[in-house]
């Protein structure tokens, strides 16, 4: 519809009429109201105004561009001399612009440029003037402040001077007044003396004058005393300042003297010190002493160490060597002692490799035995004969050994071993590691006996007598493991026994670490192991049952036997450990101990009152009821077991828990099972070894040693050991390192073999099942047990469609290497009771890596499960939306068959799919090509209306057919 007035044009533009009136007035079109007529010229002026205001130009309408092409052919000879025809196309392009537009545009541009330059110059001058005014104002302000400060100082000085002058004048006036008063008093006294009687006139004025004179004398004395005190104080202060300066000067001189003495002492040669402390040699002739002390022109004085080394050679007349003093001047042989000091020679001797037939340690002989060194050593060689009989050694060859270590075991040079290996066809280096078979062949080739050492077995390194066969067996405290279902009160029971509050500090109120404590009771010491009750911590409970003597099975009286209770019973029975049942929470109203007993009897735990061997003790961790009876039963079981262990022997134990502390390094909680573990011992725990640098008890207090059944926390291992590894004390750190490295290599081989098998298995499964979604994860936990439990729990979530892939799992904080690994593998990092450092957080933000922190295992498992649910392919469901009956069929050229239909049920949508039914049999399933009502395309047709429909790629439509219209919806799935 054409717009004739302002209101209609505004409705067409979908904008308020008031705004359109403002734009028209700005464009120079005078329209007062919405009903004013609007012509095409007015619209054109409005359009030009809007284009100019938005920066558009109408240059495209005022210029014409012509392009002309011209094609020609040229002939040119190629490299072979043949003529070739080449098509050449020439393009010419010309643009024609109206002159008035060009001139107007140029003038406008020049004017605009001039205006801009003038405006910029004006702004620059205004800015300079403003800056200059600010600078002048600032300088004037500073000048005013300086003048005010000087005036204030001058006023203060004048005020002080005036006050001092007024004080002086007041003092003079007081003194003059006192003198005038004294003179008047004397005159009055004299006049009174003349009038009155002589005796009385003389006595009274005399008293008054005496009092005045005494008062004046006292004032003068006080002034003199004050002046004297001020003078003494000033003199005292000056003396004190002079004394302090003198003290500072003396200290400086003393420090300089001390520094000078230290420099002189450090610059003093060492040989003078050695010579001063050398004991006298009475057996030496005095002449030799004088010669050595003074020296000669050809032989300077030797240091004390070198002279002492030269004396034994001087006592051997059979050597035949000429004296150094008698050597000719032209002899170029290097004399001992002319260029090296004694301590340098000793160091050279120590560095040399001692071999048979060379007692000098290789000193003063180059690595090439040249002719220059032969004459010097011929006589010394005659004094020592190498053994002619070969020495056959028994060499214990471990699983792996380096070339240098093998040569050291045979007491030969490493180069000899390398030569033998080269003859055998192998090029090796001094640090290359050989396997056991190759090393044994080399040993036999060199004429020694090779024995295979079983270094992986720690018992082979210790003599049976040292292990404890002769050590005295002494009674040891029992190790008691507290087991049961989650939230049955295991930690609370231990807290009441230990008088501690561990359960209150647990995240989520559940135990997620295995804890070790020892408690002193009136009847002895008892060591407790607290295990988690959650189903994920199966391995922790198994370790606790392995290291224990007695199991306390905690069962809640109001809950009964639960799955983890049954698991704890199976662990205890597998280890052959006696069970003491503690029925907890008997203080609750809903407690039913009899039902608990019946359920435990069904699991094979029979109470003593029923004829079994398991004592049942009802307890309450809240009120403390039955705790003493429980401890009594535990100690009674320990007495029956007669637990003993050697004390004076190397310690053996088991790793209860291990973690990586940021400040302490690898930390392991060890339960000593036999012997005594002391600080400084060399321990081996699985693939980790080291010397015990620090040892703490369960309360964090340092301890020097730990006996049997005592849990301690040790530091100083090379890496984090595995929870459950055996700990043994070895006498030699080198052997411990050798065993640990061998175990690492074997563990690495087994791990690689498992990975290869897993890869092959997963590849075959993927080929059989198709595409499988993977959720890569990197898990970092605070302790080994938590990491192990979390990995197992997450791996159990894997299904046939979505699998959890543990890229890496370790103990400790989240580092930059973990973030880089996550970037490469596109994994999510899970931190369980750990945090990422600043560099790792920054790198994760830069690379978009998701880091999740958890302190409760439930939360971690639930969130990973939700993430896996989101990765599942959605389920597709068909929803029938309507039914259509074909009433008439039309054949349309170039279109196909069109069905005239009636919607009998539901609704038909343009985007729906269609299923064609003929006699209730599906003959086609496809999509709608068009949906029309009369001549218009529509999006949907509801029930009771007619419509026209055509199907894609299907024209076999017959009257009476039915169309079933349906939609496919996707429904999210969950695990």
From Swiss-Prot:
One Pfam match, given by its short name, reads: EF-G_D2
Cellular component GO terms, alphabetically?
Answer: cytosol
From the UniProt entry, list the residue stretches annotated as the region Disordered: 48-84, 98-388
Cite the residue spans of the region called G1.
484-491
Q: Where is the tr-type G domain?
A: 475-644
Report the GO molecular function annotations.
Answer: GTP binding; GTPase activity; guanosine tetraphosphate binding; translation initiation factor activity
State its location(s): Cytoplasm
UniProt cross-references to InterPro entries, sorted A to Z: DNA-bd_dom_put_sf, EF-G-like_DII, EFTu-like_2, IF2_assoc_dom_bac, IF2_II, IF2_N, P-loop_NTPase, Small_GTP-bd
- Looking at the record, which segments are called G3? 530-533
Amino-acid positions noted as binding GTP in the UniProt annotation, renumbered to this chain:
484-491, 530-534, 584-587
| Biased amino acid composition, Gly residues | 359-372
Q: Which UniProt keywords apply?
A: Cytoplasm, GTP-binding, Initiation factor, Nucleotide-binding, Protein biosynthesis
Residues annotated as region G4?
584-587
Q: Where is this region: G2?
A: 509-513
Region ranges (G5): 620-622
User: In which residue ranges is the amino acid composition biased (Basic and acidic residues)?
Assistant: 48-63, 120-177, 212-263
Bias (Low complexity) ranges:
104-115, 178-211, 302-330
Instruction: Tell me, in a sentence or two, what this protein's role is.
Output: One of the essential components for the initiation of protein synthesis. Protects formylmethionyl-tRNA from spontaneous hydrolysis and promotes its binding to the 30S ribosomal subunits. Also involved in the hydrolysis of GTP during the formation of the 70S ribosomal complex.
Q: Which family does it belong to?
A: Belongs to the TRAFAC class translation factor GTPase superfamily. Classic translation factor GTPase family. IF-2 subfamily.
Task: Supply the name of the protein.
Answer: Translation initiation factor IF-2
Origin organism is: Burkholderia mallei (strain ATCC 23344)
């Amino acid at each position: 519809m054409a717009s004739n007035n302002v209101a209609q044009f505004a409705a067409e533009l979908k904008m308020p009429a008031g705004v359109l009136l403002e734009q028209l007035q700005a464009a120079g079109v005078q329209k007062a109201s919405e009903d004013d007529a609007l012509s095409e010229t007015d619209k054109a002026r409005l359009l030009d105004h809007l284009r100019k205001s938005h920066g558009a130009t109408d240059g495209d309408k005022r210029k014409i561009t012509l392009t002309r092409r011209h094609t020609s052919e040229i002939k040119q000879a190629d490299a072979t001399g043949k003529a070739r025809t080449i098509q050449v196309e020439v393009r010419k392009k010309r643009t024609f612009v109206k002159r008035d537009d060009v001139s107007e545009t140029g003038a406008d541009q020049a004017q605009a440029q001039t205006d801009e330059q003038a405006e910029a110059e004006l702004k620059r001058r205004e800015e300079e003037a403003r800056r200059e005014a600010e600078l002048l104002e600032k300088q004037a302000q500073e000048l005013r402040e300086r003048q005010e400060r000087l005036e204030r100082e001058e006023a203060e000085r004048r005020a002080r001077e005036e006050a001092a002058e007024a004080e002086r004048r007041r003092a003079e006036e007081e003194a003059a007044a006192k003198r005038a008063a004294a003179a008047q008093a004397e005159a009055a006294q004299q006049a009174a003396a003349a009038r009155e009687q002589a005796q009385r006139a003389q006595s009274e004025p005399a008293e008054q004058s005496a009092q005045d004179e005494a008062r004046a004398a006292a004032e003068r004395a006080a002034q003199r005393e004050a002046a004297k005190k001020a003078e003494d104080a000033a003199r005292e202060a000056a003396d004190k300042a002079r004394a302090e300066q003198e003290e500072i000067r003396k200290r400086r001189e003393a420090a300089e003297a001390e520094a000078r003495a230290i420099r002189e002492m450090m610059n003093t040669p060492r040989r003078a010190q050695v010579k001063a402390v050398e004991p006298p040699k009475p057996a030496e002739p005095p002449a030799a002493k004088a010669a050595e002390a003074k020296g000669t022109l050809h032989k300077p004085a030797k240091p004390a160490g070198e002279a002492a080394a030269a004396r034994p050679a001087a006592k051997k007349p059979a050597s035949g060597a000429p004296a150094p003093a008698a050597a000719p001047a032209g002899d170029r042989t290097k004399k001992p002692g002319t260029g090296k000091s004694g301590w340098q020679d000793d160091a050279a001797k120590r560095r040399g490799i001692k071999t048979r037939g060379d007692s000098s340690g290789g000193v003063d002989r180059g690595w090439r035995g040249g002719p220059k060194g032969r004459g010097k050593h011929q006589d010394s060689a005659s004094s020592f004969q190498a053994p002619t009989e070969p020495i056959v050694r028994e060499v214990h060859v471990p699983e792996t050994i380096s070339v240098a270590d093998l040569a050291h075991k045979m007491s030969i040079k490493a180069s000899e071993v390398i030569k033998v290996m080269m003859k055998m066809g192998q090029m090796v280096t001094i640090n290359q590691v050989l396997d056991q078979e190759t090393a044994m062949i080399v040993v036999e080739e060199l004429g020694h006996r090779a024995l295979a050492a079983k270094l992986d077995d720690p018992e082979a390194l210790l003599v049976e007598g040292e292990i404890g066969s002769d050590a005295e067996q002494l009674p040891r405290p029992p190790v008691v493991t507290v087991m049961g279902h989650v939230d049955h009160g295991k930690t609370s029971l231990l807290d009441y026994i230990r008088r501690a509050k561990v359960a209150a500090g647990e995240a989520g109120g559940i135990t997620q670490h295995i804890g070790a404590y020892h408690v002193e009771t009136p009847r002895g010491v008892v060591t407790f192991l607290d295990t988690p009750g959650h189903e994920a911590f199966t391995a922790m409970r198994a370790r606790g049952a392995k290291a224990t003597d007695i199991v306390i099975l905690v069962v809640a009286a109001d809950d009964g036997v639960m799955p983890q209770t049954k698991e704890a019973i199976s662990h205890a029975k597998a280890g052959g450990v006696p069970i003491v049942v503690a029925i907890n929470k008997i203080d609750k109203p809903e407690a039913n101990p009899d039902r608990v007993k019946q359920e435990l009897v069904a699991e094979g735990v029979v109470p003593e009152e029923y004829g079994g061997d398991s004592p049942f003790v009802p307890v309450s961790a809240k009120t403390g009821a039955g705790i003493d009876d429980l401890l009594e039963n535990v100690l009674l079981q320990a007495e029956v077991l007669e637990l003993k262990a050697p004390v004076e022997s190397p310690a053996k134990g088991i790793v209860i828990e291990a973690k990586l502390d940021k400040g302490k390094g690898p930390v392991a909680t060890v339960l000593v099972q036999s012997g005594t573990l002391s600080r400084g011992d060399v321990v081996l725990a699985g693939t980790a070894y080291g010397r015990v640098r620090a040892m703490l008890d369960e309360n964090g207090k340092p301890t020097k040693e730990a006996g049997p059944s005592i849990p301690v926390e040790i530091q100083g291992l090379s890496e984090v050991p595995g929870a459950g590894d055996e700990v043994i004390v070895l006498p030699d750190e080198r052997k411990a390192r050798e065993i640990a490295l061998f175990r690492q290599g074997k563990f690495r081989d087994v791990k690689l073999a498992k990975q290869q098998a897993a890869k092959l298995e997963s590849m075959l499964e993927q080929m059989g099942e198709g595409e499988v979604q993977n959720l890569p994860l990197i898990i970092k936990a605070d302790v080994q047990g938590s990491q192990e439990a979390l990995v197992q729990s997450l791996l159990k979530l894997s299904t046939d469609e979505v699998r959890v892939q543990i890229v890496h799992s370790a103990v400790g904080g989240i580092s930059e290497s973990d973030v880089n690994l996550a970037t490469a593998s596109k994994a999510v990092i899970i931190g369980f009771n750990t945090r990422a450092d600043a560099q790792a957080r920054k790198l994760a933000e830069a690379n978009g890596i998701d880091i999740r922190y958890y302190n409760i295992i439930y939360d971690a498992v639930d969130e990973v499960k939700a993430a896996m649910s989101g990765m599942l392919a959605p389920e597709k469901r068909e929803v029938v939306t309507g039914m259509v009956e074909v009433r008439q069929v039309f054949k349309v050229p170039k279109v196909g068959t069109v069905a005239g239909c009636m919607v009998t049920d539901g609704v038909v949508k343009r985007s729906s799919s269609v299923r064609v039914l003929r006699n209730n049999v599906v003959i086609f399933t496809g999509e709608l090509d068009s949906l029309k009502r009369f001549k218009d395309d529509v999006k949907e047709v509801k029930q009771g209306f007619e419509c026209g429909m055509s199907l894609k790629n299907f024209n076999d439509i017959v009257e009476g057919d039915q169309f079933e219209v349906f939609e496919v919806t996707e429904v999210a799935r969950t695990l």
